[in-house]
Structure formats: C-alpha cells, structure tokens
C-alpha cells in the first residue's frame, strides 16, 4: 500500500486507521503536522520533500517488494475487503489496472467515480459522479482509473515506466491509463473494492488550472497517434480557443498561457516523451477510440451556454472521422 501525503492533516490518520494490518508506505511529500509523527508509528514513512505526486508514487513503489502495488490518496477511507478485491481482479493476465468503486465520504450513498471519463480533447472527469452508489454493480472496462484508489501489477507498472514525473501534479493517472491501453491491457473498475473519498466538486484554483491544462496537452500530444491528431485537429483547436475564452473570463488566462509556453520551451522533451509513449503501442486507434467520448458533461465542467450545440457538432464530427481510424 502506498500513500503519498502532502499536508494531509487528520485525513491521513483516518486513512491509516482504515489500512490497519496492511503493509503501508507513506511518502511524505511535505507534511509537517502531527499526522506524520503518528504515521511513523504505523507505517514506513519516507521523507521525500515536495517532489510531486508521480515522483512520490514512484518512490513508494521502489520501497515495497509487493507484486501488486496499491495506491490510495490520504483523503480516502478503505473499506474491509477492498484491497483483496483489487488483487483478485489483477489475477486476469490482460488486466493491468483496477480502480476501486469510489463513494463520496460525506454522502456515501453517492458515487465519486465509477471509472474516469476522457473527452476526445483530453479533458477528463470522474464518471458517474453523484449517481447512486449501487448503480455500479458489476466490474467493467473504463478509460482510466482514478488515482485516488487503484491497483496495478508491479511488472506492468515497470513495463509502462511508472508515473511521468515531469507532470508533477494532476493527470498522472490519465496518462498511466492511456499507456496501459496503448500496450493492449484492460483497465477495470471493481465495485467489490469499496473506498470512500473526501471529494468535493469545485472550481479549481489558478495553479491547479495550470497543471490540469498543461498536462492534458502533454497527454494528448504524446498518447494520440498522428492520424488521430489530424482527424481531431478542428475539435482540438475549437476546444483550445473555448478554454482560452473561459480562462480569460474566469481570470486564469495567464496560467493557460504558461502551459502553452512550457510546452514550447520543453518541446524536445515532449518529442522524446512522445516517442517513448508511442513505442508502447500494440493496438491501433480503432481499439482506443471506444474509450473517448465526444460529449462534455456540464455537471462536471463549468461550461458556457451553448454546450449542447457544441456536443452535437463534436459528436457528428467524431462519428464521421472514426471510419478513417
């Protein structure tokens, strides 16, 4: 079990309470409170400094010899039997990653995520958010697993290269899921693995918007094939212009521009990262297309009026271009 903690407060203590009896590694990414001293009595604690989520996860993975790596956020409460259910699902050789059913901690009759969803533009959000918890009753394939609570086989984690540390924060789980799909593995959500998550849907702050947007573009540029990028170019451009307008209205256009500037400055790294990612590919775009949706969910994203028309246009475009995949 690997928990990456950053100023997690009492949430970390609550999380460790739910993991009693498990072999837990806590990566201290910047915690300074009494929760770290408490964690040291119940888990192996590694002081990493604020190296970012992905780097913290990679460090934690190196500190455990387990064949199955289970990652949970410090703001989760893992229910009895969840870890065993995740491990059982990974016994299927074609399954690489398994997400737990995530319920809202403060409204446990509702889902936080039944598997995360990816738009053709790379925008992503927790699927099933707010739905009744019993709406997820059977394991199923998903686009990618939420980083809040998931398991992956160690050999697959190594094969995929672990988390990309350059992302630093946000979208690491999205990229890992895409690399698993490129390699031909399946990604599942398993309702028998039950986890509560202290998640609140709210508008991101400016710094979070920077990482979300920059990293979304890193994933799109590295994971999509050239053909898919060309076919989706009008959609990607329209979404990018729309997001720039939203950023201007909401006051985070500077952060949006910082993301573009980072990509330009680091274009050599991005090209190298794309080559490494595409080298994993064992399946074609037709197989991957089923994990992309052309419909933006207005419940999850703060979208302008007219989104229904945009969804209709993008859906029509996606239906048309998929025949060329």
Regions found by a protein language model. Give the residues of each.
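Conserved donor NDP-sugar-binding/catalytic core segment of glycosyltransferases
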Residues: 76-119, 123
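Active-site-adjacent helix/loop segment of glycosyltransferases
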Residues: 183-298, 311
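Short, well-formed alpha-helical segments that are part of the catalytic scaffolds
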Residues: 5-21
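Short, flexible, basic/aromatic active-site loop/helix in glycosyltransferases
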Residues: 119-142, 158
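Glycine-rich, basic loop-to-helix element that forms the pyrophosphate-binding segment
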Residues: 47-64, 74
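Short aromatic/hydrophobic "clamp" motif used to bind/position activated sugar donors
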Residues: 69
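Acidic donor-binding segment of Leloir-type glycosyltransferases
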Residues: 16-49, 59
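A short, conserved alpha-helix in the catalytic core of glycosyltransferases
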Residues: 143-194
């Amino acid at each position: 079990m690997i928990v990456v903690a950053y100023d997690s407060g009492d949430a970390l203590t609550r999380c460790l309470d739910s993991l009693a009896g498990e072999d837990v590694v806590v990566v201290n990414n910047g915690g300074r409170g009494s929760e770290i001293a408490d964690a040291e009595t119940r888990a192996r604690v590694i002081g990493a400094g604020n190296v970012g989520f992905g780097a913290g996860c990679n460090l934690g993975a190196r500190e455990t010899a387990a064949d199955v790596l289970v990652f949970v956020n410090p703001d989760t409460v893992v229910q009895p039997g969840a870890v065993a259910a995740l491990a059982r699902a990974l016994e299927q050789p074609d399954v690489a990653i398994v997400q737990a059913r995530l319920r809202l901690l403060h409204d446990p009759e509702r889902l936080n995520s039944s598997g995360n969803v990816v738009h053709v533009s790379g925008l992503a959000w927790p699927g099933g958010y707010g739905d009744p918890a019993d709406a997820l009753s059977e394991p199923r394939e998903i686009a990618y697993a939420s980083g809040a609570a998931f398991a992956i086989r160690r050999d697959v984690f190594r094969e995929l290269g672990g988390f990309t540390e350059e992302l630093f924060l946000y979208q690491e789980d999205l990229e890992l899921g895409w690399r698993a799909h490129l390699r031909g593995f399946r990604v599942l959500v398993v309702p028998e693995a039950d986890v509560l998550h202290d998640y609140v849907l709210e508008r991101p702050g400016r710094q979070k918007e920077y990482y979300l947007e920059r990293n979304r573009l890193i994933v799109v540029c590295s994971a999509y094939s050239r053909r898919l990028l060309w076919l989706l170019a009008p959609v990607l451009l329209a979404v990018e212009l729309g997001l720039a307008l939203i950023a201007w209205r909401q006051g985070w256009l500077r952060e949006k521009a910082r993301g573009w500037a980072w990509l330009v400055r680091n274009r050599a790294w991005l090209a190298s990262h794309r080559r490494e990612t595409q080298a994993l590919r064992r399946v074609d775009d037709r197989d991957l297309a089923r994990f992309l949706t052309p419909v933006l969910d207005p419940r999850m994203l703060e979208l302008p009026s007219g989104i229904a028309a945009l969804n209709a246009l993008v859906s029509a475009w996606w239906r048309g271009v998929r025949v060329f995949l």
